[in-house]
Amino acid sequence: MTISKKSLVGLMLAVAAVSALVFSLQAGASRGHHEKHGKLFGSGLVGNVLADAPIHGVNRAGAPWVLKRGTVRLGPNGRFELRVKGLVLAANGTTGTVTMIAASFFCSPDSNTAPAFTAGPVPLASDGDARIREKVTLPSRCLAPVVLVRIQGAAGPGSFIAASGFTS
């Protein structure tokens, strides 16, 4: 049995068309949803500056903070992870009197002053390194998510020293 070149080309085009349709349907079916190992939210972190306005009613700390590296991730299974390296006061490169931090996750609108959740507190090492890993309860819907890294005091989380975002 021999297949003409015309029939072979037609068969290959049909297979390609069916494959494209299957892949597009599969991609469309998961739009707006995330696979088990995906991420719902991820961002870099930036230190605060004196010009920062309150975010969700939380004031920035009284002095600027910088960091070498910072990331935050939230998975669809509720796994929250925040890492900071070198989160220190801009003026002197130390953590000053700050020894503990927490991370608050907020959703819009900005007038919402109650976080969806707060993770931590965890120790902030003298070199400004810290890591928070927690399983959290996810909000059912979240628009414009923002994470604030906050000074943890005896009364709970206070001012923010870093937030989700970037600098150029």
Language-model region placement:
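Short amphipathic, basic-aromatic surface patches that mediate peripheral association
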Residues: 86-94
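Helix-rich interaction surfaces within compact, conserved domain-sized segments
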Residues: 112-168
